[in-house]
């Protein structure tokens, strides 16, 4: 009876210690994700072009998604199992473990809802810039003054076109 209680106490201590280790790493990952996403949302995005590190992050996410889709086409399992199912070297050094952890963290960041929302906003900004260049090309072909004035919504209309019969006091 005492031996059984001792085993139960050891098992609970082991469980609590493993949960605390897991929660620390999960908290670190969540803090990293939160820091990265707040930096994305806090910095202002210029209408001309986004900062280079944000585009690099978008490119990295698309690269990771392309790798995952290529692995799925090759017949591998779900997205969660992609890192685990790849052939790993027999001897894992610190660099390979850190690289695998980094890839896994990048996958989680790319799949997070906040980043996907930011990516959609970024694509809309880039598409909006392309639409403006298309409109400017149309203006260059047809140069009428009225069309050019109607195209730019952000400029206020000047009140120099007035009726001759109106009086101002």
Curated annotation (Swiss-Prot):
Pfam families: Pro-NT_NN. Residues 1-22 form the signal peptide. The record marks 159-161 as: Cleavage. Keywords: Cleavage on pair of basic residues, Cytoplasmic vesicle, Secreted, Signal, Vasoactive. One of its GO terms (biological process) is response to cocaine. The keyword ATP-binding does not apply. GO terms for cellular component: axon terminus; extracellular region; neuronal cell body; transport vesicle. It is found in: Secreted; Cytoplasmic vesicle, Secretory vesicle. One of its GO terms (molecular function) is neuropeptide receptor binding. The keyword Ribonucleoprotein does not apply. PANTHER family: NEUROTENSIN/NEUROMEDIN N, NEUROTENSIN_NEUROMEDIN N. Belongs to the neurotensin family. Neurotensin may play an endocrine or paracrine role in the regulation of fat metabolism. It causes contraction of smooth muscle. Interacts with NTSR1. Interacts with SORT1. Interacts with SORL1. This is Neurotensin/neuromedin N.
């Amino acid at each position: 009876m005492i031996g059984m209680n001792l085993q139960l106490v050891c098992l609970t201590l082991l469980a609590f210690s493993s949960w605390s280790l897991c929660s620390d790493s999960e908290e670190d990952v969540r803090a990293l994700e939160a820091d990265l996403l707040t930096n994305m949302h806090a910095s202002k995005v210029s209408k001309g072009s986004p900062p280079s590190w944000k585009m690099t992050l978008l490119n990295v996410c698309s690269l990771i998604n392309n790798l995952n889709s290529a692995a799925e086409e090759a017949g591998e399992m779900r997205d969660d199992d992609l890192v685990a199912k790849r052939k790993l070297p027999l001897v894992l050094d610190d660099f390979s473990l850190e690289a695998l952890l980094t890839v896994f963290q990048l996958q989680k960041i790319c799949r997070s809802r906040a980043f996907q929302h930011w990516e959609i906003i970024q694509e809309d900004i880039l598409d909006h810039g392309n639409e403006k260049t298309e409109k400017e090309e149309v203006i260059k072909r047809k140069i009428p003054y009225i069309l050019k004035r109607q195209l730019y919504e952000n400029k206020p209309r000047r009140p120099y076109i007035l009726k001759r019969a109106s009086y101002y006091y």
